[in-house]
Amino acid sequence: MTQRHLVVMAAGTGGHIIPGLAVAQEMQHRGWTVSWLGTEQGMENRLVPPAAESGIEMDTIAFSGLRGKGLLHTLTGGLRLLGAFAACAKILRRRATTAVLGMGGYVCFPGGLMASLLGKPLILVNADAALLMSNRALKPVADRIAFGFDGAAAATTRQAVVTGNPVRAEIETLPEPPVRYAGREGPLRVLVVGGSLGARVLNETLPQALALLAPAERPRVLHQTGQLNRDGVKEAYAAVGIDDGVEVLAFIDDMAARLAHCDVVICRAGAVTVSELCAAGVASVLVPLIVSTTSHQRDNALYMAQHGAAIHLPQSELTPQALAERLRTLDRPQLLGMAEKARALSRPRAAARVADEIERLVRKDGL
């Protein structure tokens, strides 16, 4: 049988890239080869392990979208888009592509359109309940759209299937919360995650909030800041006299181990983040990102809070005083209960479900 090859398209943020890696690994376990289509400067160049380690070779194109970067950028956008179309078509042919998976990011529009024109099955993963912008554009040519959550968009999309969001296998297979929480003593363990790009409001608020707590009340904190913010956050903790019990990292490579170790996570409420919290079974304080055009993160946070799986703390209410009071009142029995409720909301085997859809389309097309 001819070797089957999947091209994964994902760029820009960990929320696109990390679930793509989960599906890529699942397809490799099924005997497929996998390559990655990203952008020249994107985070995918760091997050996707080298081919010698992962077996995933990287192809990149020079494309960063059409909007919001000045008049000249917009005026030359058509030429750059044509160049991106040509580059994607060349890559898909050279890779002898069997199917194409779009996870999100600028690369998905030219890559997805070329996949359709070349007759390759095109599967899109839509992390939120509402359709993402690139997926709206590609909806007419997509063979399948795998939704992370139920919602009106999935119900009204002909090609829709609700799979849940793909989660790293090492997170999905963590022990149940009661096993992890058993025997824990001492200060609470707080994991602060601003996402792969960092979250400014969390970086600014956490040091001030901890400074309001007496030393005996302070949790131990691991704070992930984003690549550009590490030094500034370390200085902020030092400025308020907190030198002990806090570890500051730009990025967390072994997220599963960190989730397993912590009692509670303070983070944004992106769809992939929420899916990982549920898969792991971890309590959380969710501070949704404020975006004028969507309410996705707020909806995610409310959903978790309504099920007792998280505390929803709107950014408009996030002050050092409010966060300090939240931390002061948390205890492990309460957090264990939240963790168990989060685990109950998980959708196991999402990566395998997406892989099933890919193989189903390939069989249908006789490839």
UniProtKB/Swiss-Prot annotation:
It catalyses: di-trans,octa-cis-undecaprenyl diphospho-N-acetyl-alpha-D-muramoyl-L-alanyl-D-glutamyl-meso-2,6-diaminopimeloyl-D-alanyl-D-alanine + UDP-N-acetyl-alpha-D-glucosamine = di-trans,octa-cis-undecaprenyl diphospho-[N-acetyl-alpha-D-glucosaminyl-(1->4)]-N-acetyl-alpha-D-muramoyl-L-alanyl-D-glutamyl-meso-2,6-diaminopimeloyl-D-alanyl-D-alanine + UDP + H(+). One of its GO terms (cellular component) is plasma membrane. Pfam families: Glyco_tran_28_C, Glyco_transf_28. InterPro entries: GlcNAc_MurG, Glyco_trans_28_C, GlycoTrans_28_N. Its EC number is 2.4.1.227. UDP-N-acetyl-alpha-D-glucosamine binds at residues 13-15, 168, 196, 252, 297. It is a peripheral membrane protein. Pathway: Cell wall biogenesis; peptidoglycan biosynthesis. Keywords: Cell cycle, Cell division, Cell inner membrane, Cell membrane, Cell shape, Cell wall biogenesis/degradation, Glycosyltransferase, Membrane, Peptidoglycan synthesis, Transferase. Signal peptide: none annotated. HAMAP family: MurG. NCBIfam families: murG. Cell wall formation. Catalyzes the transfer of a GlcNAc subunit on undecaprenyl-pyrophosphoryl-MurNAc-pentapeptide (lipid intermediate I) to form undecaprenyl-pyrophosphoryl-MurNAc-(pentapeptide)GlcNAc (lipid intermediate II). This is UDP-N-acetylglucosamine--N-acetylmuramyl-(pentapeptide) pyrophosphoryl-undecaprenol N-acetylglucosamine transferase. It comes from Methylibium petroleiphilum (strain ATCC BAA-1232 / LMG 22953 / PM1).
